[in-house]
Amino acid sequence: MQRASESFDAIVVGSGISGGWAAKELTERGLRVLLLERGKHVEHAKDYANARKGPWEYPHRAGRSRDMIDAYPVLRRDYPLNEKNLDWWVNEKESPYTEVKRFDWYRGYHLGGRSLTWGRQSYRLSDLDFEANAKEGIAIDWPVRYADIAPWYDHVERHAGISGSIEGLPQLPDGQFDPPMPLNCAEATVAGRIAKKFSGRRMIPGRVANLTQPRPGRGRCQYRNACALGCPFGGYFSTQASTLPAAMATGRLTLKTFAIVTDIVFDRDRKRASGVRVLDAVTNATTEYSAKIVFLCASTLNSAWILMRSARDVWPGGLGSSSGELGHNLMDHHFRCGASGILPEHNDKTVYGRRPNGFYIPRFRNLFGDKRDYLRGFGYQGSASRQGWQRAVAELGVGGDFKDAMSMPGPWQIGSTGFGEMLPNHANRVTIDESRTDKWGLPVLSIDCETGENERLMRRDMMNDMAEMLEASGAREVRVNDNGSFPGMGIHEMGTARMGRDPKTSVLNAHNQVWDCLNLFVTDGSFMTSSACHNPSLGYMAFTARASAFAVEELKRGNL
């Protein structure tokens, strides 16, 4: 092993949503930062190889080949794996993991991580979420409240570019929004009828990290709905389009790709992290890099893996394990449960472009005096559109009349799936499986996680409530569905290094510092103390920016 000759003020591990924000905030506040990414370099626009291709330009018309299906046993289960997005997903044979219970882990090891492929829905937590654990006696209390985080939501929204509408809903705080992507005519009709017939229920435009107004160096969304291929216009928030250019512009960022962080180097005398050990993914050489502070942003499960492999001579369970909570309380959102129907009106209208967004129905259960036989609640995400020629694939029509009929759009269809909160549970955990190794000889992660009775009870309402709203709005042929949801499918994995008020019951404090090592900050989904019911990535941005500002001030004071 060799030691790098240059030391840094800060090391950031991971270049996804959290890592990109840490790099931006720390460099802009004057620190010299080393950003480490375990995967390949991806240059903005230039390396989005499929962003402008049509399906006819692929060997299998942007579908799946048998080789792809065989090579990706996890991705093939549910995610729409195809020729278009194959570049963004981990080779599962090179990077396996152990499933004690089924867990679908969708990983992207490359510069930018899943900031290139995320769904971009961006919602704030409220005190309803921050206070729920304490009020209900579940797990532990969050060490922060909305007032602590609200200024940082403002900060990241202004830079990232979140489009949305001002609604004044207590369960879903408003933000610093660009103009929303409007509901289409069918959605607006249903939204009006829901508001009229159901107290406390609202259908609003999704709040999404797609620009409706241009930013410096970024164009507004082109309504292509090809976001998961990388946007050469910078129309949605990603590391490449937003935070990385800002960090690079400071002249204080050093970027290294193909750099697998295997563990945090811990100085047991100072009780501080002195740096990280890095395995070169190409040469297998190991190098130790040093810094005054470390930000661990490798994504929830990889950050847990790194922590559990660090300082084991001091704590057998790894760095941050003194509470016994490291690796525990893994959560995800459960979904794929809702309803759909046909609207018999607006057949003289159709959609404009390919809007990369839909509607959102914020949580309404267990609020405003409503009391169910389960805790917490769910929100809905969905959209309405005209049916296309695919509606006739299963029919046996032939001839000119049939062809003419299929050349016209079909009726409006509307559908939605609920996203439900998953309660924290100590039994849902990850460990290191020393009996299996990956391509680089490193032991793999073992995941033992399942939903519980609370989630199962919630799914009944997720299905029936949507059907009720559609029927009341005039939809016909309303059908309910529950296609099952295993942890990991939501791609919102969080927990394993929760923040709290007491080092005896949590891994991190209120500023995302590891209690056992105060110059080590963890700001990806690991820190989540509960899951709420909506997409968490905006929260990761806000907490990362807040922790970065705090870290710089603590460095100046000599406390780190």
Where are these regions (language model features)?
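Short, glycine/acidic-rich hinge or "gate" loops at secondary-structure transitions
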Residues: 44-47, 163-175, 476-484, 557-560
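A glycine-rich dinucleotide-binding beta-alpha-beta segment and adjacent secondary-structure elements
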Residues: 204-211, 219-225, 262-269, 409-422, ...
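N-terminal glycine-rich phosphate/pyrophosphate-binding loop and immediately adjacent elements
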Residues: 2-133, 138, 143, 147, ...
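Conserved redox-cofactor binding core of oxidoreductases
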Residues: 59-66, 70-104, 109-110, 118-124, ...
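Glycine-rich loop(s) and the adjacent beta-strand/alpha-helix scaffold that form part
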Residues: 28, 32, 39-59, 250, ...
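Glycine- and acidic
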Residues: 134-138, 173-177, 225-231, 290, ...
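A conserved FAD-binding loop/helix module that cradles the flavin
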Residues: 530-548
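FAD cofactor-binding and catalytic pocket of flavoenzymes
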Residues: 85-114, 118-119, 124, 142-143, ...
